[in-house]
């Protein structure tokens, strides 16, 4: 018995420890990926190339030139309707804010992208599915106005399930507001570039996201108004293979280019330098 006790495995004491996960699993192919490699690869699977969702902060770090990003999105949402479903809207907002560290579903600021002055706005899908409510709409409108006033390009990275139902008509109103704000950018002949990521749906697709001078999309991104399941149930027909995915939209002229995330900044810089009136275009850059 003494010998058995000697070799018996002892359980570690101290309860649950905060040990970081070292591996992550690809949602598409199931490959086990070393988390550090996954992050360095911008959340793209090195095995199959599947593009996982990228946090807003990491998206900004990927696109903005180092040390140039100055945040301008600081508005906080209210609950003018006193909306309650299974729980009060204000409680949902507090939970999302605690989870993401963001006041709402958008992160934006002034920066340079490849030396081109820009206003960069990135939607955060982790906050209420990136839904567009009063704050998101107002921040986009203010960002567009800032770009026009300061002669900056406007770049918006979309990731959204659409309008925020808890704000009802106030949310739908943001579609018109964001579209109207783009007029100031175009009046100054400044470039507006949209990047559609997975997913971009609903009122976001039906408003500012689809109106850019140049529209990039990430590989495999779901892009559309209603989701495929809703459409299938409505028309009672099977949908074409790849329907509403970025490659399908490229084939049918709805986006200009499907670009791997790891090459996105390079291609974005090329477009901005070509279109921005205050930047001399250098062929081959």
Curated annotation (Swiss-Prot):
Gene3D superfamilies: 2-enoyl-CoA Hydratase, Chain A, domain 1
EC numbers, comma separated: 2.1.3.15
Family, as annotated: Belongs to the AccD/PCCB family.
Involved pathway(s): Lipid metabolism; malonyl-CoA biosynthesis; malonyl-CoA from acetyl-CoA: step 1/1
NCBIfam families with a match to the protein in the record: accD
Organism: Thermus thermophilus (strain ATCC 27634 / DSM 579 / HB8)
Localisation: Cytoplasm
Keywords assigned by UniProt, alphabetized: ATP-binding, Cytoplasm, Fatty acid biosynthesis, Fatty acid metabolism, Lipid biosynthesis, Lipid metabolism, Metal-binding, Nucleotide-binding, Transferase, Zinc, Zinc-finger
Cofactor requirements of the protein: Zn(2+)
CoA carboxyltransferase N-terminal domain boundaries: 22-285
Function: Component of the acetyl coenzyme A carboxylase (ACC) complex. Biotin carboxylase (BC) catalyzes the carboxylation of biotin on its carrier protein (BCCP) and then the CO(2) group is transferred by the transcarboxylase to acetyl-CoA to form malonyl-CoA.
Catalytic activity: N(6)-carboxybiotinyl-L-lysyl-[protein] + acetyl-CoA = N(6)-biotinyl-L-lysyl-[protein] + malonyl-CoA
GO molecular function: acetyl-CoA carboxylase activity; ATP binding; carboxyl- or carbamoyltransferase activity; zinc ion binding
Taxonomy of the source species: Bacteria, Thermotogati, Deinococcota, Deinococci, Thermales
Record gene name: accD
Primary localization class, coarse: cytoplasm
GO cellular component, one term: acetyl-CoA carboxylase complex
Pfam families xrefs: Carboxyl_trans, Zn_ribbon_ACC
Database matches in HAMAP family: AcetylCoA_CT_beta (MF_01395)
Keyword Electron transport included in the entry's annotation: no
Cofactor binding remark: Binds 1 zinc ion per subunit.
ZnF (C4-type) intervals: 26-48
Designated name of the protein: Acetyl-coenzyme A carboxylase carboxyl transferase subunit beta
Positions that bind Zn(2+): 26, 29, 45, 48
BP terms from Gene Ontology: fatty acid biosynthetic process; malonyl-CoA biosynthetic process
Subunit annotation: Acetyl-CoA carboxylase is a heterohexamer composed of biotin carboxyl carrier protein (AccB), biotin carboxylase (AccC) and two subunits each of ACCase subunit alpha (AccA) and ACCase subunit beta (AccD).
Family matches, as InterPro entries: AcCoA_carboxyl_beta, Acetyl_CoA_COase_Trfase_b_su, ClpP/crotonase-like_dom_sf, COA_CT_N, Znf-ACC
